[in-house]
Amino acid sequence: MAAVLAIAISLVGLGAAGWWWLQSQSPLKLQHQSLTTPATTRFLPADANLTLVLEADPGRLPDYGRAVAPMRQRRQAAEQLEHLRDALFAAAGLDYATELADWLGDESALALSSGDTPGWVLALSSRDDDGGRQFLQRFWQSRSLAGGDLDITRYRGLGVISSRGQQSQGRPSTTSPQAEHPPLASALINDQLVLLASSRGQLEDALDASQEEARNLAGDPLLEQWLGSNRQGIALLRGDRQGIEQLLGLPASWSADQPIEQFVGSLQLDGAGVRLAAQLQNSSGESIAPLSRRDQQLLGNLNQPVQLLSLSRPNGPLATLFNLTAASDDILLPALLEGEQPLLEAQLQDSKAWLIGSSDSAPPAANLNEALAKQGFDANNLDGLQVWSHLTGQSDRQGQLQATVAGATGVAQSNRWWSNSLDGLRAQLQGHGSGGVPSELLERLNAPSGAIALLGADGRSTAELLKPWPLWRGLQLLAGQRLGPSLQGAALALSQDQSSAELDALLTFR
């Protein structure tokens, strides 16, 4: 009996150990990975305009894509992530499969500088003592055989190899990593870290910065504070206003009088999607009051599917992102967006019609009626709705005069709703549905209770929002395909105090 019990205990122990090993090796662990202070940050200059640190083995990303994709799409998802990963390294002149795959560790960092002396520094950790050294030997040997002139010197006690760069067909040298043989420089740190830079000067700046805590990201107070709040993710982001505007191609203004000076953030995998959490440092200014519970209840009272929705103050931060764009002949929507009260703004699904909701059920102000009357639209009651319309002077087939409708408004559940579509307004007032994908993603985002603005979008609207963004276009070029059809949707939340703001975003794929 004792022998049987011992065998049973051994089997249970082996099973538990096997289960633990499988869980520890699962690519799904990347979803809940805790971020730590990367060793590479010591060699990343604090004055770089944009820095990205990946705290994961790039070789595991295709496995993750395979694990979270639907059964029929697993191979395709893995191949797409593999292609995108390889293309990103190729943009820096590196072949992942032949030069990096067999030694690259869990940290890869890129620091970018723009302005008068643009350049970059790439820091790559090695999973063993020989990988980085062997990589550099092969790396420079291949470039030497291709005709590159190499300089081998020492700087701060380290061996530094650099090349002046060569271009075919007589083109001038450039610091772009996409040049055929761009000028490069490298150094090996304690056999554990490879530094590559776009020039010898950039590399020396990184080595100089490593000797002074105030000059490298390891001593950055904003990054230290961010990591001190137990963040999860696979990547860290750090940048300044110039990095936002020139490298990310995004507006760096929180509002007209509050530029964004710095930011720090992290990227976290979430199923077939990615989360961004970021803190934006801006100049001191007046704080925006959070959305009230009653305002946020508008989201739950949305009774029909929409393709885009937001809940914010029309004159609040990043207003162009949250406010609907009015058509040239729309006179009601611009008038509604002149107010200061929070509004739910929605684009109805598969329609050009919009829907506006307010937790204030008061009747329309007299000045709104006057403004519409000046445009020839009179207010009339129709089946319990207030409708602004004017006769066109034309008749339909039944001989009745036709009318053009500017919009209408009505009340349900103590909320006032507006729309430029009578059918859309009636569906909202009488329906019992939900907002569809945008509402579902906002719920999944789980925005903070102190949010000042919320945004949700389906796949098509997300693609339209991302379309003008240069970085999104660049990712599609690297991926070799349009990414818009793969989008399920996005959600975003903003919160704020006097000198900083929090941004939480979720981007999901089908």
Predicted regions and their residues:
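A eukaryote-biased signal for long
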Residues: 314, 326-327, 334-370, 489-509
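Short, isolated positions within intrinsically disordered regulatory regions of eukaryotic proteins
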Residues: 23-25, 107, 124, 144, ...
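Single conserved position on a long alpha-helix in the C-terminal lobe of the eukaryotic protein kinase
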Residues: 52, 96-223, 339-444
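Leucine-rich, highly hydrophobic segment in Treponema pallidum outer-membrane-associated proteins
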Residues: 2-21, 31-40, 171-172, 189-190, ...
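Structural boundary/hinge residues at secondary-structure and domain interfaces
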Residues: 3-6, 12-157, 239, 245-256, ...
